């Protein structure tokens, strides 16, 4: 009995250490405490979870490395815009957290009536917490300059 308890404890400690190491390796070079979403600090676990959700739901259009589709500033034959990058080369950081959350949840057309986009509305696919985790992951990849610029936009628009 005691032997099983020791074995289970050792397994639990090993699993926690592995999760912590994985979380640290997955989150980029930014410390989690340097990233906020809707004015609240995010955790390393949120960033790691966001990266996983991004890979499953967003990378097929926005790129595995957040690079967006090629020639993303030029309209497609359909008249729609390609998926933009979410790294510092794109314009994601030009928008407040509230706007990014709304666009992800409702789709671009749900935020800008009449705008046609290939972007899905993820509100029925992902929970609010999952959307927030994806956005925390994206923000964790931005250099300090972009995070600071986006923070000024959030402050100007009321903190979101």
Describe every region a protein language model picked out.
Residues 24-53, 148-153, 157-160:
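Electrostatic cytochrome c docking/interface patches
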Residues 10-24:
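Hydrophobic alpha-helical membrane-insertion segments, chiefly the h-region
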Residues 43-46, 96, 127, 143:
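General structural signal for secondary-structure boundaries
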Residues 75-139:
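Extracytoplasmic electron-transfer domains, predominantly the class I c-type cytochrome c fold
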Residues 124-160:
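A charged, solvent-exposed segment within the mature domains of Sec-exported extracytoplasmic proteins
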Residues 1-4:
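Positively charged n-region of N-terminal signal peptides that target proteins for export
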Residues 30, 44-45, 51-81, 105-115, ...:
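Periplasmic/extracellular electron-transfer cofactor-ligation site
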């Amino acid at each position: 009995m005691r032997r099983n308890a020791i074995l289970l404890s050792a397994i639990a400690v090993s699993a926690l250490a592995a999760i912590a190491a994985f979380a640290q390796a997955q989150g980029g070079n930014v410390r989690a405490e340097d990233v906020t979403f809707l004015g609240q600090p995010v955790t390393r676990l949120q960033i790691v979870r966001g990266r996983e959700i991004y890979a499953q739901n967003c990378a097929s259009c926005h790129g595995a490395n957040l690079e967006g589709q090629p020639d993303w500033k030029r309209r497609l034959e359909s008249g729609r815009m390609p998926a933009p990058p979410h790294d510092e080369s794109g314009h994601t950081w030009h928008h407040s957290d509230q706007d990014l959350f709304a666009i992800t949840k409702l789709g671009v057309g749900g935020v800008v009536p009449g705008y046609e986009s290939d972007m899905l509305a993820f509100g029925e696919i992902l929970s609010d917490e999952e959307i927030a985790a994806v956005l925390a992951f994206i923000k964790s990849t931005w250099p300090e300059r972009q995070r600071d610029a986006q923070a000024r936009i959030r402050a100007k628009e009321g903190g979101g």
